[in-house]
């Protein structure tokens, strides 16, 4: 009996100890939950009933100098899944099945995104850049699937397609590597849209606005109970270019319709260096990167041509360079403009025969320039010497970059005896003759030739070209002026030299090879060129500057058509169309242009 009582007391004591331990564990757990981890569990509870739908701010717009929005924003919709909704596999599979056709995604991809949202407990973006057509069907599906929501945003839009595409560039989704490099205070998220090329890339920080977001209170089924906070976005700053809309479009259309559809056209203001037009063909349509995600866009699979021939293509300037040869001879005093030189169609230099493109007979300075007589310039160059020609080359900065703020600009190649001497190679009379007509090792970009035309038009001011005039903040209204005139160098030729060059180039337009740009009411000065190409058809050049009759030149341009053969026939019509567009002499009907679209605040479409 005593043994039994002792055994019973021991068991009772053990049970009491176990109960005490269990009670202590429970008490500690309660302390842990209610005190030590109170904030963590509170945040978890808040997360279960609060969801955030991010709203991407509209990018700043890009305008031409005459106020046309060439990069703007269009309405679009984003589609979210709120993780507070139902989470059972059958429901999620059916949801993916019904959504996939409207999102132009596979069921597996939709399900993967939904499951990711369930796992993270955050609102998950299923699709963006949706068109109005898809949103109508998705709005109906919201009635059957609590927890899926549409939100109205904007997407990038290029109303004029490939207009100045090599300058404006395009946007695309950033990858993880790019995201890690970005300033996170700017509000970037993985897959945010950023500038990938051109102005879109260069001015990314200015064009990108500050994103907003809608903080929602949702119930256990994912239905919206209330909007806790609506943080409005702020649009990015607007960029204003120096481009003239009609002029740029005339350049692009001309290149597109040319013999080969390949080339470049550049126009500058010879009074400031502002870029009035800069076109490279073939161009590309940046809309292929920002099309509606639910619409078929077969162009997206095509590789775009980002090569900017205007600043990256280098070619011999051909007969447009005869202006340099003429200037050198005039400066050196070896040229009597009244002296006539006979052109029998060829020029003998020792055992070599250098041909002219025609038989011109006796020609003086003005006829030699206007008829682009090679023999005339062979004689003048042999008397003047290559060193004098090279000196004038350097005055106009040949062989150097123009200084424009564009990536990948080529400097071209300066051609002359000094350069040869540096390379410890000989210079021959044949080199001088080739140099005199812009052939041989001399290479230039179309932009360089436009800069040269502007320098002659301004009587020696070699300007740094610029294409952005100002940036205007949509948040503060402040204007940041970027367009500043910068004279890189002064081509200090004698005033009489410039007078004679003007007269010869005017004679070329009125009576010579540049007659295609003779336009009533304008004083046009021009020069044609046909660059020899040992690998195929020759290239066509046209260089000109012009002003209203009796006024100083207000535009200088260079047109280049790759494989276009004759400069007059291939590049001349484009130059004429550009001048007519710039001076609006053809008096076109007022173009219907897009409004300076002010983006409406985003809206959330709920099923509550």
Please report, for each region that a protein language model flagged, where it lies by residue.
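Beta-lactam-recognizing serine transpeptidase/beta-lactamase-like catalytic domain environment
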Residues: 71, 218-228, 263-319, 324-563, ...
